[in-house]
């Protein structure tokens, strides 16, 4: 019986993450910069740079070092992903509140904001500005991580942050860590196999540990032959189509389905939505459907407990259930020859997000013109505009409002709903009426302006002549 069976429930990247600062390998220079910065906070001396930006390749220890410092200095760590909290409102509400939080049972609070280079400056307008505002007033240290900190839109963050570079890990360091894990797990391993895994990781220790666990869990030992068979080169992430194929087409080994979901390019909740919508498209037998949905439901339960209870060791059960659990649920029928479908839930969420963004932009436009807050516009003005745009018998009225305030087509659609095309036509008609039936060419417009100026000048001269002929009797009235 393989010895790994008793410990395979916990991902080794979690089980063996550094508990102390000295456990983080090959990052001595980063430690020399970051540890004194944290000590200044703990001693009540707020540094000039209230945020730190850690940058370097994936899997080199950026997050691990912050976790180790928090553990060693007895700090409460609030970890957020910038990809999830990237809009202005999210950052002000979530990150802003965390920046003022006080810990009841520990020495202090540290905020870890992962993947700030994942913020989209076009889609998430205002996110960087909101983050800068939070950094200026924060009462707690803010640590951000990025793989590429030199993107143009991150320049304001670089200027206010302590920049800490993390070096790529060497082959020697990765092999040493893998060797220690094998010894702790009492796994038989070949040095050449560990070196092979380390080479394929391309300096990513986290990926190397995942590959080591995949080999050890599948066979109970780590040999060069097994490593070559299983580790096919570093795949940072597996695209969704390959992930679904590995799940629904029942791989030869359970670990293959598990690896497919654990290294998928999609996050856990999105991946569950993909699998959920495609189970009935691939499985036809009722008993197979029951087992697959049951496994996926249990995966959802464990994911919820991991996220909201903070017990991330349960993540291993999530991988087992939505990977091998769904794959081996098919015991009777064949895989149906139907195409994968895009999850309806994700499609609806994308549409709702677009509606929310349009609503925010509309509120911002109206707030500037009406000298009101955006909140007041949303609660007091938008309901009235909704009624006018959707209930007005004459589409000219809402069309004139839209033109007056410079509303875009999406904003009109938000307010008008099914009457969008009717009001857009009315807007075009009003525009033509304002400009005349034929839009003026530049030369014609110039000639018209000269004519209008000449008419105004002639009017002024006539007025002066009339005033000269007016005597005192005019003002005193007839005697």
Curated annotation (Swiss-Prot):
Q: Where does ATP bind?
A: 56-63
Q: Does the keyword Magnesium apply?
A: no
Which residues does the annotated region (Disordered) include? 435-479
Which keywords annotate this record?
ATP-binding, DNA replication, Nucleotide-binding
Q: Give the matching Pfam families.
A: AAA, RCF1-5-like_lid
Q: Name one GO biological process term.
A: DNA replication
Which Gene3D superfamilies does the record associate with it?
1.10.8.60, P-loop containing nucleotide triphosphate hydrolases
Source species, domain of life: Archaea
Write down the InterPro entries for this protein, in alphabetical order: AAA+_ATPase, ATPase_AAA_core, P-loop_NTPase, Rep_factor-C_lsu, RFC_lid
Q: Where is the composition biased (Basic and acidic residues)?
A: 435-461
GO MF, any single term: ATP binding
Quaternary structure and partners: Heteromultimer composed of small subunits (RfcS) and large subunits (RfcL).
Q: Which family does it belong to?
A: Belongs to the activator 1 small subunits family. RfcL subfamily.
- Briefly state the protein's biological role: Part of the RFC clamp loader complex which loads the PCNA sliding clamp onto DNA.
Protein name, entry field? Replication factor C large subunit
